[in-house]
Each structure stands twice: as C-alpha cells, then as structure tokens.
Amino acid sequence: MQVDEQRLRFRDAMASLAAAVNIVTTAGHAGRCGITATAVCSVTDTPPSVMVCINANSAMNPVFQGNGRLCINVLNHEQELMARHFVGMTGMAMEERFHQPCWQNGPLGQPVLNGALASLEGEISEVQTIGTHLVYLVAIKNIILSQEGHGLIYFKRRFHPVRLEMEAPV
C-alpha cells in the first residue's frame, strides 16, 4: 500500500471514531484565538490532565504556546453553529467569534463558553511534535460543569447531537 493511500484509509478509519466536539480557546499577551477540535482526551485524573492535538501548520500554535494557558469547552448539542465558526466553515473572523454574547473569562482569564457541557481551564505543561500535529499536555486548574444539555459529536465527517434517553423506572 502506498503512503498516500494508507494516509487516506487512515483518515477514513478515523472518521468512524465518534468524538466529542470542543472549542479550545486561549487568551493572553500573545493574543486570543480558538479552534474546534475533536482530538482531545483525558490523560489522568491525578493530577487532572488533558491532551489536545492541533495541526502543526495552524497559525494558532504560537498564540497557544505564547499564552501558556487554554480552555477546553465541551460543546452541547445546541452549539453546532459555534463549532462551525471556530473550524472556519462560516467565514466569521476570529475576533468576531469572541464578540458573541456567550463568552466570559474564566478564573484563569481564558475564554469560557457559556452553556458548554464542561469548560476546563489549564496550563500547558508540555508540547510534543508527533508527525503533522502538536500534542499539548494540559494541567487542568479550573473546571466548570453544566447540569443541562446533551452532547455534540463528530462522526463520519458530520456533526451529530447525542441525546440522553430518559431511563425507565425500575
């Protein structure tokens, strides 16, 4: 199998991996930006740590690294349009994305999305280059949880809501 064919088959296989949709944001002396990401996962709960992967060619990497902090906003099913803004599907400029009324600053000064299922603010403790991506290891310092909302996932190159079914009484 040639390298290009294997790369395409790998991408098709990864499209079958349903993943939570997140907007990863940062703000500080290096600037403010955010990106929609599905390559986000927990590493350990002691100490709370998360891994975030961003394409190495992204112009946002110097901003994330320069600020040294970020926030992972786990989107609810009603926030698909915001996900589309931050992936660049709508043509909305970066600063305009943050002028929406749904943003506030968290305790670490990071952009927190109101209504997100969870917002995890943390400090970037390590950055590794692996192939085409930078892998950020983030030490979580502040967690905001929402009691409302259903999930939003990305599966087969499309957004899908994930709704909790009501449990039948036992």
UniProtKB/Swiss-Prot annotation:
SUPFAM superfamilies assigned to the protein according to its UniProt record, in alphabetical order: FMN-binding split barrel
Reaction catalyzed: a reduced flavin + NAD(+) = an oxidized flavin + NADH + 2 H(+)
Record key words, sorted: Aromatic hydrocarbons catabolism, Flavoprotein, FMN, NAD, Oxidoreductase
Keyword Phosphoprotein: no
Enzyme class: oxidoreductase
Taxonomic superkingdom: Bacteria
Enzyme Commission number, as recorded: 1.5.1.36
Protein purpose: Catalyzes the reduction of free flavins (FMN, FAD and riboflavin) by NADH. Subsequently, the reduced flavins diffuse to the large HpaB component or to other electron acceptors such as cytochrome c and Fe(3+) ion.
Name the record gives this protein: 4-hydroxyphenylacetate 3-monooxygenase reductase component
Organism of derivation: Salmonella typhi
Origin organism lineage: Bacteria, Pseudomonadati, Pseudomonadota, Gammaproteobacteria, Enterobacterales
